[in-house]
């Protein structure tokens, strides 16, 4: 998201956490009729506003690993001190590389922080292209582990393709992480906060679109069908809006759709939706879906 909006949300979160002493009981309203689709809501868990409000990833290696979450409270102090003050929606390869996307408020680069299967951390920096946006909202690794997709904030008709940092042998922390290709979308998308592969050529994405003019609904769950599995070159992408994400809270105001994860082992799709106002503390949710 843009730096100014992020700073306002971070300030609100910090203030609310410091002041919150009462428990607010959430009263859920029914989902809107337009929310019907191929993915059916099956449950939800509370999303902690500091440590679970930006993204999530299921991790297969090592075995029995817990799900990983990101939020302003998960950013290491050392990274924040160097200006990397926003973390987006992470992903992990099936072989155990875990990847977090980071951005600064200014500059000409974005960074991916990678934990190898053995536990060591490395940083891979990408220098922005001439027309590339600064933000670094999410990372989605192809099922073969070799290619990583990322996106840009705003209204876009493309996704960016990189070699997967750490997992792809062509990458090195000491060298620039290059963009090698582009996914050319046949329909514009807006404010995509996360994507994850559900198959070799299929992405599921959470959009924070507040306007609704692109697909006739706000905050949509999107599917992007690629013309071929990522191989580092350009591919086409066909975009479909599947349904509106749940927007339920005790508070009224602007919701924020955040990260997304598809767990191939269980077939469960999870999406974080942050509640408005004070309810960011009490009834922000990670919603669960199954395909019907």
Q: Model-found features: residue ranges?
A:
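Secretory targeting and sorting signals
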Residues: 1-35
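A short helix->beta-strand "capping" segment at the edge of beta-propeller domains
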Residues: 35-50, 69-75, 242
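Beta-strand-rich domains and repeat architectures in extracellular enzymes and scaffolds
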Residues: 44-68, 85-89
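Surface loop/turn motifs at the tips and blade-to-blade linkers of beta-strand repeat domains
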Residues: 44-51, 78-83, 126-133, 183-188, ...
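Conserved beta-strand position repeated once per blade in WD40 beta-propeller domains
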Residues: 52-56, 87-89, 138, 194, ...
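Structural motif
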Residues: 66-70, 105-114, 155-164, 211-227, ...
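Blade-loop segments of beta-propeller domains
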Residues: 69-103, 123-127
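Loop/turn-rich, solvent-exposed surfaces of beta-rich toroidal or solenoidal domains
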Residues: 187-238
């Amino acid at each position: 998201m843009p730096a100014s909006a992020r700073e306002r949300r971070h300030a609100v979160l910090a203030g609310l956490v410091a002041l919150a002493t009462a428990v607010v009981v959430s009263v859920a309203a029914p989902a809107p009729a337009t929310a019907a689709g191929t993915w059916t809501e099956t449950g939800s868990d509370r999303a902690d506003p500091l440590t679970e409000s930006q993204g999530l990833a299921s991790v297969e290696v090592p075995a029995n690993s817990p799900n990983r979450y990101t939020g302003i409270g998960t950013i290491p102090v050392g990274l924040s001190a160097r200006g990397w003050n926003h973390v987006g929606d992470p992903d992990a390869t099936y072989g155990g590389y875990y990847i977090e996307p980071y951005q600064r408020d200014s500059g000409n680069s974005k960074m991916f922080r990678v934990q190898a299967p053995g536990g060591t951390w490395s940083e891979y920096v990408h220098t922005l292209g001439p027309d590339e946006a600064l933000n670094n909202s999410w990372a989605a690794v192809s099922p073969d582990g070799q290619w990583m997709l990322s996106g840009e904030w705003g209204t876009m008709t493309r996704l960016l393709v990189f070699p997967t940092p750490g997992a792809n042998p062509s990458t090195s922390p000491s060298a620039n992480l290059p963009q090698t290709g582009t996914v050319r979308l046949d329909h514009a998308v807006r404010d995509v906060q996360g994507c994850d592969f559900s198959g070799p050529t299929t992405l599921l994405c959470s959009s924070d679109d507040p306007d609704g003019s692109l697909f006739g609904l706000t905050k949509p769950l999107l599917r992007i069908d690629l013309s071929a599995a990522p191989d580092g070159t350009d591919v086409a992408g066909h975009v479909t809006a599947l349904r509106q994400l749940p927007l339920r809270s005790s508070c009224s105001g602007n919701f924020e759709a955040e990260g997304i994860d598809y767990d191939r082992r269980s077939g469960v799709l999870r999406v974080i939706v942050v509640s408005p106002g004070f309810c960011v503390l009490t009834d922000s949710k990670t919603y669960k879906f199954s395909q019907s």
